[in-house]
Amino acid sequence: MNNCTPNIKSSYGYEDLLASGRGELFGKEGPQLPAPTMLMMDRVNLMTENGGLFDKGYIEAELDIHPDLPFFGCHFIGDPVMPGCLGLDAMWQLVGFFLGWIGGKGKGRALGVGEVKFTGQILPTAKKVTYRIHMKRVINRKLVMGLADGEVEVDGRVIYTATDLKVGLFQDTSSF
């Protein structure tokens, strides 16, 4: 795998992310992002094949917060907060996106996480969530797998951290 795909860029806008969800960005054999309302980012500001804390790759993405986001209406009524699992899922989404960006093929699946810590919350009054992913390792064998650490920041404050985020790309998910 390498980053010599014809559509390689270092940043992606919302329309690009939607194209990924339709299988158009990295091709039909590449991993896809989910479509809205499960797509947890509005843009990817920076992707590098090197860099990050481990010099194995770095991703920075953002989600604009609006009070009318669907989860605020039901989680919880009278006490709206973005579910923490959605921030965790966003980090998995970005690891899978990185694997497609470097040329990986297959259907992306979250495989696990070492440790997650929540030290804050995302309320409808927030303005922006920033995700930072530090790739630790990419394995390219029968299974393509990415391993990374990540953090979620709201309005400049880190509120979630995750270690050993694992995402795999599968050619066949029928036995997964």
Swiss-Prot record:
CDD domains: FabA (cd01287)
EC number, UniProt record: 4.2.1.59, 5.3.3.14
Main location, first listed in the record: cytoplasm
Pfam family, one: FabA
Disulfide bonds: none
Catalysed reactions, as listed in the record: a (3R)-hydroxyacyl-[ACP] = a (2E)-enoyl-[ACP] + H2O; (3R)-hydroxydecanoyl-[ACP] = (2E)-decenoyl-[ACP] + H2O; (2E)-decenoyl-[ACP] = (3Z)-decenoyl-[ACP]
Subcellular localization(s) per the UniProt record: Cytoplasm
Any GO CC annotation of this UniProt entry: cytoplasm
InterPro entries in UniProt: FabA, FabA_FabZ, HotDog_dom_sf
Keyword Disulfide bond: no
SUPFAM superfamilies in the record: Thioesterase/thiol ester dehydrase-isomerase
Signal sequence residues: none
Keywords tagged on the record: Cytoplasm, Fatty acid biosynthesis, Fatty acid metabolism, Isomerase, Lipid biosynthesis, Lipid metabolism, Lyase
Superkingdom per UniProt: Bacteria
GO function term, MF aspect, one: trans-2-decenoyl-acyl-carrier-protein isomerase activity
Residues annotated as catalytic: H75
The protein's assembly and partners: Homodimer.
NCBIfam families (UniProt xref): fabA, PRK05174.1
Protein name per Swiss-Prot or TrEMBL: 3-hydroxydecanoyl-[acyl-carrier-protein] dehydratase
Record organism: Haemophilus ducreyi (strain 35000HP / ATCC 700724)
